[in-house]
Amino acid sequence: MEHITAQDYIKRLQTAMERNSRGPREIEACCEYAGRLLDARLPVLFDAAHVQSVLRLKEIDWNQAYHVFPISQGVKTRTVTAPSLPLKTRQRWILTEILPRFEVSPRAHGFEPGRSIKTNAELHAGHEYALCLDIHDFFPSIRKESVIRVFLEAGYSRGASSALAEVCCFKKALPQGAPTSPRLSNIIFKELDERLEAMAKRRGITYSRYADDLTFSSHGGMGNILREVERLLRPQGFLLNEEKVHFYGPGVPKRITGLIVQNGSVRVPKEYKRRLKQEIYYCKKYGVLTHLENTGSKKFVHYREYLYGKAYYIHMIEPEVGNIYLEELDQIRWPGFFAGEC
């Protein structure tokens, strides 16, 4: 794609509009509008028709735009709304070209560069008390009008903002499986993050958020913070999941975003490491294929990647421990198709 400066873009725009016999006021207004977006390092999109043209939205079959399916999580299921490949491509364009220009709260640790479940949990290491909360139906609770406001605040027209929001939403809310949803949720939740942090700070409490997981910790008690959190969330359309309220007192291991926080350190749960160790043991003792046949595993095709993924996850949290598991996996005699030899 040809790279042109903002000044060149404005000149070309002005020339094109003059050729099409546009009036001076309209030309001036369009050039000023484009200039503001270019100064903000945003792509120029004038209205809904322009968004449709640039993103080639007519090529999308909107009747087949999403695939909705459940994913098992223990005894419960979570509904994923996955966009079709053509729609996902457009959403990724919005994610890379528009959404990085927005600021999010430093307390938001999910889906942000340099932040992770580890950095989220580390904030609370060494604290005696912790309260972990979960927002019910987080993405579906973020409505289309909130997404429109994101693009309006960026400087886009109402028409362009509505069209961009339409690409990012499903049934007038953020879908669980769209690549734009995590970043949009962090942008939209920024004000609430700041209010929650300020409320917690006044009480000497540390606050962080990873997607829909809210964590508060302190060296003292929590007081009535649960009620205060609900008071801040409810007017914005967010409700807490009452079944996922976890309070931890002194001397108790704290499970924060799936990790164990205890004695000032952050670790992967023992049961997670134990299961991986067990699978490695059986692969070495019986061979990979025999082990999979004995267990009736459905992970047959990507089993090697599955195990290495677990080891790299451990390595991200506990590098030295993760290295041990990676070395153990390297010692397994993988069949040719697992090792990429065919």
What are the residue ranges of the model-derived segments?
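A short, basic-hydrophobic beta/loop patch
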Residues: 162
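Catalytic palm active-site di-aspartate
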Residues: 132-136, 177, 181, 200-218
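Right-hand nucleic-acid polymerase module
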Residues: 1-71, 79-133, 138-154, 165-171, ...
